[in-house]
């Protein structure tokens, strides 16, 4: 009986530790430093949260999370049931997002515990730009594991064809076609993607902009911070 209880206790402890490891593979702190309210959004985990100036939202991302996005929504109005709309980044008219936001929106993207035990992460302007952003490991380890940012005045300098209320849209949404959307094989930069790249060289400016825009950190030992208006 004693042996069985010891086995069960050890099994429970192992299960508990495995569960904690799974649940807290990475902590992502989202902070709003903008002088206005930002309605932060996060998929596939997190949903959404109103962040007034100086407020922070902590997201616990499980191991293996991928195709994940964090972005900010602006000029939103929601009722008590969490339904409404946003000028930029709207995700189907709900506070707690389950799908991606409507462009333009500056994106922090990540995938945890992928190839070679690495986290992959980036800032993307493929969906356009609405809010300045930094995305950084809280414990950088050198190499490709360091802070990146996109803080240029893109909204103020946005080319006329891409200008929309509250942001600077992306050429795929604006014009469509393989040249801008890269949906049918290889593609290269355009004058519009170069506009974004010149101002935010660490960020994706078009879908195949991987060499200068994708960053990695060791899985399981790295936490992250996203800051709006750093």
From Swiss-Prot:
Q: Which domain of life is it from?
A: Eukaryota
Q: From the Swiss-Prot or TrEMBL record, give the protein name.
A: Osmotin-like protein PR-5x
Question: What PROSITE patterns does the record tag this protein with?
Answer: THAUMATIN_1 (PS00316), THAUMATIN_2 (PS51367)
Q: Which organism is it from?
A: Solanum lycopersicum
In terms of CDD domains, this protein maps to: TLP-P
What's its top-level EC category? Answer: hydrolase
Q: What does this protein do?
A: Antifungal protein. May bind to beta-glucans and have beta-1,3-D-glucanase activity.
Predominant localisation class: secreted
> Which positions carry the signal peptide feature in this UniProt record?
1-25
Q: Does the keyword Cell inner membrane apply?
A: no
Keyword terms of this UniProt record: Disulfide bond, Glycosidase, Hydrolase, Pathogenesis-related protein, Plant defense, Secreted, Signal, Vacuole
Q: Which GO terms describe its biological process?
A: defense response; response to fungus
Q: Which Pfam families match?
A: Thaumatin
Q: What GO MF terms are annotated?
A: beta-glucanase activity
According to its UniProt record, the EC number is 3.2.1.6
Cysteines joined through disulfide linkages: 34-229, 76-86, 91-97, 145-217, 150-200, 158-168, 172-181, 182-187
